[in-house]
């Protein structure tokens, strides 16, 4: 049975995230959001023209581990009221990646000047949302301990293609001892909207990762001898897949720099 929400606890989180979003909106904060406001849901963001939105929606539905869909918004809608008070997707993410013809052309802190009335926003679940549950269970998260971004890798695991959208899964990695890994599986399997259980454990070469010390995105972390790598689906997958499609323009969050919502992580169960 899910524990009742402590209203004072939630109110404290909401005050914290309101202040944090103000600093993000002003451009003062542009770091990774991993570990920030633990207890609240973080979301990967994809923004693309309406003409491509239906196929991308189907892609998310066919690939729920890599692209767990929290919400999709009407064309032109930039205030994401279902995710929180006064959330403006054009300004409230630390950094955005802008892609033109499948190529990342710039990184921005504010995309208000690029906004189009036909843009459709997708909010996808993020593994940062279950980090709090892991910590509550006594598990140490390597990248948080080293104050760095999570390690993310492109794999050889194919997604289920839809229309022009095709490519391989991107994963995030956190090292644990075997016993801790079992506990992490049990915990994260309760959060399907935050990528759920790991898709692979151990032997990175089996999923096409040649070097853990050279992540495709994010930062590398030290892996102790008694630890094994544990891999979860990752919301950077859409960046790779949509880039492969070479559509004229799309925008995403920068890897590791998410939209922090007003929703409690327990609401993702």
Curated annotation (Swiss-Prot):
Its EC number is 4.2.1.-. It holds the Pfam family D-Glu_cyclase. This is Putative hydro-lyase Swoo_1731. Gene3D superfamilies: PSTPO5379-like (3.40.1640.10), PSTPO5379-like domain (3.30.2040.10). The keyword NADP does not apply. Disulfide bonds: none annotated. GO terms for molecular function: lyase activity. HAMAP family: Hydro_lyase. Belongs to the D-glutamate cyclase family. Keywords: Lyase. The lineage of its organism: Bacteria, Pseudomonadati, Pseudomonadota, Gammaproteobacteria, Alteromonadales. It comes from the Bacteria.
């Amino acid at each position: 049975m899910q524990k009742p929400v402590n209203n004072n606890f939630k109110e404290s989180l909401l005050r914290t995230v309101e202040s944090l979003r103000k600093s993000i909106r002003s451009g003062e904060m542009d770091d990774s959001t991993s570990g920030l406001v633990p207890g609240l849901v973080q979301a990967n963001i994809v923004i693309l023209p309406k003409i491509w939105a239906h196929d991308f929606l189907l892609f998310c539905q066919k690939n729920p581990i890599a692209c767990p869909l929290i919400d999709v918004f009407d064309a032109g809608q930039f205030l994401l009221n279902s995710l929180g008070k006064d959330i403006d997707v054009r300004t409230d993410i630390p950094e955005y990646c802008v892609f033109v013809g499948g190529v990342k052309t710039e990184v921005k802190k504010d995309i208000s000047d690029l906004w189009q009335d036909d843009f459709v926003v997708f909010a996808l679940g993020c593994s940062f949302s279950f980090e709090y549950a892991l910590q509550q269970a006594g598990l140490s998260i390597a990248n948080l301990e080293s104050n760095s971004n999570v390690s993310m890798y492109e794999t050889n695991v194919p997604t289920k293609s839809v229309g022009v959208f095709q490519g391989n899964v991107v994963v995030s990695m956190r090292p644990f001892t075997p016993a801790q890994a079992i506990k992490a599986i049990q915990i994260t399997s309760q959060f399907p909207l935050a990528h759920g259980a790991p898709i692979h454990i151990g032997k990175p070469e089996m999923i096409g990762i040649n070097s853990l010390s050279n992540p495709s995105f994010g930062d590398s972390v030290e892996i102790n001898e008694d630890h094994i790598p544990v891999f979860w689906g990752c919301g950077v997958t859409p960046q790779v897949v949509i880039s492969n499609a070479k559509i004229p323009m799309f925008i995403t969050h920068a890897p590791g720099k998410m939209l922090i919502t007003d929703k409690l992580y327990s609401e993702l169960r």
